[in-house]
């Protein structure tokens, strides 16, 4: 039997190396799983800077926007109506130039009507909401990019209008709050209509869509939950979290089987 001792010792060495690799893999995947879980928890539960709960939206070009707004306001389960160009999941971009036409920077941009800020529960930390044409709301990074020394209220956006308010930080889609300069201009009868519904939200959303089919039978109008639209942008993070959890369970099972086999061989 002594002839086989070197082979047995060599075989044990490989088993130990394999076990070490497996335990290292478990530790790595466990760490990755913890990071993914914390990231997912932060994104889903962070303060958005506004209140998406109870809000539904629909992108549609109404032939008579004022009439459509009045129809929505008349419904007993609708608390408010507002509109936006863009959406709360993405904003466009527009160059800001000086009076000579030189490009200064390119902020995220959108247009709100005067009811959108209160409907969503956005906060204005300085100044006021806009009331008419050629008025703008911006955020603090925008003020800093422009090099304005004061709060920014009353400053002129070259060739375009006046800043009337500075918004408190809020999230656009999955982007962190105040991640980039933001410029919101005043608009009316914008394409993306938002409504705030009374509780129970799901039931009233169903009633709203049925009512739209009755009023506009020839048009495809469907309001969707803003919260669910936001969750679609979190889905890749949720999928990655679940994938790391499954990988951890799999490699942990393999490692335990290897450990049990090693112990049985040694006993």
Spans of model-derived segments:
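Hydrophobic alpha-helical transmembrane segments of multi-pass inner-membrane transport and secretion
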Residues: 12-39, 237-267
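Amphipathic alpha-helical segments that mediate coupling or scaffolding at interfaces
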Residues: 3, 43, 233, 265-266
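"Rare, low-scoring activations can occur
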Residues: 63-82, 133, 140-148, 159-241
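Short cytosolic juxtamembrane segments of multi-pass membrane proteins
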Residues: 1-9
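Acyl/amide activation-and-transfer machinery of modular secondary-metabolite enzymes
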Residues: 19, 51-55, 187-192
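Structured, solvent-exposed hinge/loop segments at the ends of secondary-structure elements
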Residues: 37-144, 149
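Structural preference for long, well-ordered alpha-helical segments in enzyme cores
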Residues: 3, 17-20, 36, 68, ...
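A glycine-biased structural micro-motif
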Residues: 153-155
